[in-house]
Amino acid sequence: FFFFLMIRRPPRSTLFPYTTLFRSTSQLFSDFGWATMRNSWEKDATMLAVKSGHTWNHSHADANSFIIFHKGVDIIKDGGNCWYPNPAYRNYFFQSQAHNVVLFNGEGQPREQQYSGSTLRGYLYHLLDAGNVKYVLANGTGPVSNNFSRNFRHFLWMDDVIYMIDDLKTHKVGRFEWLWHTNGTYKKSGVDVNVTNGNSSVVIRPLYPRLLAKSDFVHDYPEDLYWEEIQAPTEDLKGTETYYSFHLPAEVNRVKGLTAIILKDTPDEKDLPQMERREGQDWIGLRIRHKGKVTDLYINQLADGRLMHSNSWIMPDGWMTDAYMFAVSYPEGTEAKNAKDFFIAYGSALRRGNETYFSSLAKLFVIQKAEDKKLDLWINGQPKINTTFR
């Protein structure tokens, strides 16, 4: 029944009203590691789908991979599939290289997992859907634990931008690369990549750990991400297609990756969000300005498992929090302290001066929206919750 719903929309004459059957725009199928988030159930709406679960046989080596449908096109796509007896299935389509994942020293999940399975599976957690703000966490550490001790991928969808935050740590120093399988015309413009297919268009904008090198003269930008074009078989096996790898030149064993995927309303849209990279003591983040709204996004560098027996408190821009990540939105021309819209990921408190905006006995995932005297909350994290809000 589930697969019928996923593949084919039931006719409106079915027993259940269409609007009732598809009431939720987000769904987490935690047992087998799927999550879907969409902005509506209208035709050609935008959908983000994330996978992080078991690997074996039909379930590919794609922990933490994702696809995006936008205006009827899988604009960020999966590498595909082919007839099982063909060597391309086991050599490419099944493997991590055919999916939108992070590789370390050129390696993804061990290739033998196709036949022996992944002893440690991937997981998806903490799905939140508050309309224009959605979130899910993918933990793909287990399937790549031969190289990684942390392989977390956060998806934070705010308005018309999907922010993908990678929290990565490996057992040894080496090189990281991000894979992108696109379905459309690929055009690099400065630090952005535009992908367009008919009326569907997105911008891929890497922001951390580095920007994309601004020009093709990558030797002028030795610390920035450089790109590689890789040829792979098409799904029909009649030719080849190109996918892309963004390489970090530095050899490290811990990195935070932050990529913005901007969902354009039309291919010619020029009014795109302005994003300013910002950093402070023990945090990195962004200030996003668009359509009269400012959003400040903070990522806590102390809350990634590096501390033991100490709290991960940071004080960015006058805020005080132990949250792994938080965002605050407010109208342009006003002050952040008067904000009413918050996103908090794995935090127990948010304070500013003598004011407590949020306090909990356990760390939670929270979206808060306030208007007039109405307060809307979406909370995930503990079976029993004891918390207060301003």
Kindly label every feature range from the protein language model:
Residues P17, D31-G33, T46, D62-N64, ...:
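Residues that flank catalytic or metal-binding motifs in active/ligand-binding sites
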Residues N57, V73-G80, P85-A88:
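Accessory C-terminal segments flanking Radical SAM cores
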Residues T36, A49, I67-F69, D74-D78, ...:
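Structural recognition of the beta-strand scaffold that forms the well-ordered cores
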Residues R8-R9, R23-T25, G53, A88-R90:
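Short, P/G- and charge-enriched loop/turn segments at secondary-structure junctions
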